[in-house]
Amino acid sequence: NVRLRTNFRLGYEVMEGLNITTSLSADYSIARRNYFQPSYLDKDNWSQSVGETGINLMVLNENLIAYKKKIGEEHNLSLMAGISYQYDQMEYNGGYAKNSPSDKIYYAPGSLPTHTTQTSGGTTNTVLFKHYQSDMQEKSLVSYFGRIEYNYRERYLLTLAYRRDGSSTFGAGNRWGNFPSVAAGWSFSEEPFIKDNLGWLSFGKIRASWGRSGMHFDYPYLALGVV
């Protein structure tokens, strides 16, 4: 098995409090399996050679712009917006061959027979000696998102967030989803009456939130239906 992971990030401060960042990451893995079962382990006295290769690739690009501003001594504002793109690809190739001439032949040369017949109860069936399977799947996800954070004296906090995702796993008429959220908090440990009377309390906070979440299909072509 081999796995390679890389990440690249670049940031630039346009002005005080305003930053732009872009990042690119990739995750690549390849797994191979070769397996041989000798004939004496099979009820039909057939050996079996199996070979499989699986390849997975994930690429993620994120682009963010963020702004932070302190207004006077009491107000703090933070803004963030971004776009991301994720691409996933899975590839599989595998197969098996049975009944090699000798248990010392671990792989399946092209000269091996492709099939045989078996008769049982007056019925003759064809048994395949060779089988091959391949698969390749792709899916992508595009996201637009933003967030506004405000707090007053680090005591009263408000967060508004919004995300819009588009996934290739859904049908063309239902590809996009919208996911808003809102949260409010109170850091009561920052209140003077708490500090004066409860010196042993280092931090205390109450937070309430609401949001909408979602997920996309694990199978990339489920929305296409059965042909």
Regions found by a protein language model. Give the residues of each.
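Flexible, solvent-exposed loop segments that connect beta-strands
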Residues: 42-46
